Design a protein with these regions (language model features):
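Short gly/pro/ser/thr-enriched loop/turn and capping motifs at secondary-structure boundaries
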Residues: 89-94
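Iron-sulfur (Fe-S) cluster-binding modules
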Residues: 1-59, 64, 68-70, 74-82, ...
Length: 270
């Protein structure tokens, strides 16, 4: 009997689910025929048929942003033997976590005609803030090759093989000139987990930290201090780390050290 796979969505843009379709749809032959060895039971992005749980593996895209989301993710956790969060929204709250530095009532009043009807949390949370997660697959969006490795690892019973180094290594591998040293552009590559293939530096752009903080204790204070000494303002560096993975603990702490944590913001609430 094939392992049963389920894919779920919360607050997100669907980009990571499109990568799942890329892998399971065999758009990249080098990834193998994973669709042949996994039984996709729940995937509303790609099909309307829903197979009831329990499931062997659950992939979750998106952040938790409403009280209903909390109850739903708890039920998903109960239904999945292994739970894997995919993408920056699920692993770190996503770009929508920028609201976490403000007051939720201010946002509700600005967006909705009748804010009292809206039930939301004060923060956009990673899935791991509410349930136990077995594995996190980072990225905005995730890399199809890394996803294939994680699913293959589950099927054959081994640990996933993901990069244990920063984006700087990927720049060296592809022969990309360092934008920080050669061009004087503040770049998060030295403190960001590899996985994208250093796409932005290859186009003379700084790394924006799409894959989150490097797993090897990233030294953001040292990096931002270097950029400050070369003319970057604390405000611009605070904005640099306040992007797709802004609510990741390491990036969040460095932002707050540089520019403050937003006086008066709420931390939790319906």
């Amino acid at each position: 009997m094939r392992p049963r796979l389920a894919i779920f969505k919360f607050a997100s843009c669907d980009g990571c689910q499109l990568q799942v379709i890329d892998v399971l749809g065999r758009a990249r032959p080098r990834l193998g025929d994973l669709a042949e060895v996994l039984e996709v039971e729940h995937f509303l992005e790609a099909r309307s048929r829903i197979g009831a749980g329990p499931y062997d593996v659950g992939l979750v895209e998106g952040s938790i942003s409403t009280p209903a989301d909390i109850e739903r993710i708890k039920e998903i956790r109960r239904q999945c033997r292994f739970l894997v969060t995919i993408g920056a929204c699920a692993t770190a709250g996503g770009i929508q976590a920028l609201r976490n530095w403000g007051r939720i009532d201010d946002f509700l009043s600005a967006v909705y005609a009748t804010p009292a009807y809206i039930k939301t949390l004060a923060t956009s949370d990673p899935v791991a803030a509410h349930v136990t997660v077995d594995f996190e697959l980072r990225g905005c969006p995730i890399d199809a090759g890394q996803l294939a490795d994680v699913l293959s690892a589950f099927v054959i019973g081994r640990k996933p093989r993901l990069p244990g180094y920063s984006v700087c290594v990927e720049c060296k591998e592809r022969g990309t000139v360092c934008v920080a040293v050669a061009r004087g552009i503040p770049c998060l590559g030295p403190v960001t987990q590899a996985g994208c293939g250093a796409i932005c530096p290859a186009h003379d752009r700084e790394c924006f930290g799409c894959y989150g903080p490097d797993r090897q204790e990233p030294n953001l204070v040292s990096l931002t201090g270097f950029y400050e000494r070369h003319g970057a303002s604390r405000e611009s560096l605070g904005r640099l780390v306040q992007s797709f993975n802004a609510w990741a603990p390491e990036f969040r702490a460095e932002h707050d050290r540089l520019v403050g944590d937003g006086a008066g913001r709420e931390t939790r609430g319906p």
